Amino acid sequence: MPPKGPDSSPADGPRSKNSRPRAIRRLVIWYRRNAAVTTIVDSATSSANVAGSMAGTVAESVVSGAGTVASSVLQPLVFDPLRRLQGGSEDEGIDDRDRLWVAVDGMGGDHAPGPILEGCLQAIERLPLRIKFIGERDRIMAAADALQIGDQLQAAVDNRHLEIVASGPSIGMDDEATAVRRKRDASINVAMDLVKKKEALAVYSAGNSGAVMASAIFRLGRLKGIDRPAIGALFPTKDPGQPVLVLDVGANMDCKPAYLHQFALLGNIYSRDVLQVSRPRIGLLNIGEEECKGNELSLRSFELLRDEKRLRFAGNCEGRDVLSGEFDVVVCDGFTGNVLLKFLESVGSVLLGVLRAELPRGRRGKVGSAFLRSNLKRIKKRLDHAEHGGALLLGVNGICVIGHGSSKALSVVSALRLAHSAASHGVMDDLAELQSCCG
């Protein structure tokens, strides 16, 4: 039997239906409906079993057929949606034939290799991936022992879901980007070489972003016609299923109008292929909507984007419109984009802190928090930068995902999901067409 709704508690006393908050009333109705559906299906199944035992072979065949229909119809139409609404999940098995190889810089990051390894082990359980984990073997095994994931690591190696690839001394977070030339066998260089040799379809690193970009340019090379690669990050919008791609968010501090034009072309292809937007709306980040607003970079870039026939240019995008859902791609210089990125990373925690502070204290506050808990978790998930744990380096001849230096396991899983999505949607094929047009 489903538990009674909040309105049936004797401690609350009689209350009219109209005085109950609308959100609570909807939750009660939703819960009762789900409980009613479950009760009806359970009763029907029980009755069918009794009828089958009494009716003999013929009835048993009918019941068996009914059970098959119930499992094929009621399961996807009733129980699976209820399980998703109630926050549950039931992972389906992953066919090993569908797994794609991704090279992971295991030594990149503030706390590597521990959190990176932990995230990779979680990712191969959730995503159709195989991981080439590059790093210093002694440090990898020590991290696995410290996190008590040694058995899980060995199982992944035995199943050929993860392969440890040895590398030399790693590049530190404080090293200059030019260190990639001196430390030729560093983990990030080995990872890039695996992609270049087609032994992996994508590379992920949470290491020194300057070194990652330098290694990608030196090892993979730039696409023909692209002067500067750009880092593109996905930001949440009002529509949960429609993120906006913002680039550049940190690769190029000083830009020319031609660079922003190229960023728009790169972002247009990614939005179309991976985000499945048929005609992406391109916006230019500016201080006003009018064509005459902005500095020289903005004014000259506006002209290039407006005259580009391959783009659906939607005009200037003010800061308040980035998350509005009115644009699919927003282009800017790397300095401005990085400031915007770091600001938005703080929004989730600040917003949740304000909501918690405004909830009333005492019994009413606890009751309200209980009903809002799932909503707050969904809000946090949409705004938490760990859920968008990686950014694509667009403009190099390979799929490269850059993660936060402070990435934990959840961020690693999110970044690897992004890498898999880009690799499985044929982004590089369309980028090759772009370089033939620009060349």
Segments from the language model and where they lie:
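Glycine-rich phosphate/diphosphate-binding loop of Rossmann-like nucleotide-binding domains
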Residues: 114-115, 132, 253-315, 319
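Glycine-rich phosphate/nucleotide-binding loop
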Residues: 217-246, 326-330, 334-439
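Composition-driven recognition of long, low-complexity, acid-poor segments enriched in small hydrophobic
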Residues: 36-74, 78
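Short, glycine-rich nucleotide/cofactor-binding loops
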Residues: 101-114, 251-261, 402-408
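Phosphate/nucleotide-donor binding subsite
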Residues: 153-197
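N-terminal phosphate-binding or glycine-rich loops at protein starts, especially the Walker A/P-loop
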Residues: 76-142
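Low-acidity, Ser/Thr- and Arg-rich intrinsically disordered low-complexity segments
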Residues: 8-9, 15-26, 30-33, 38, ...
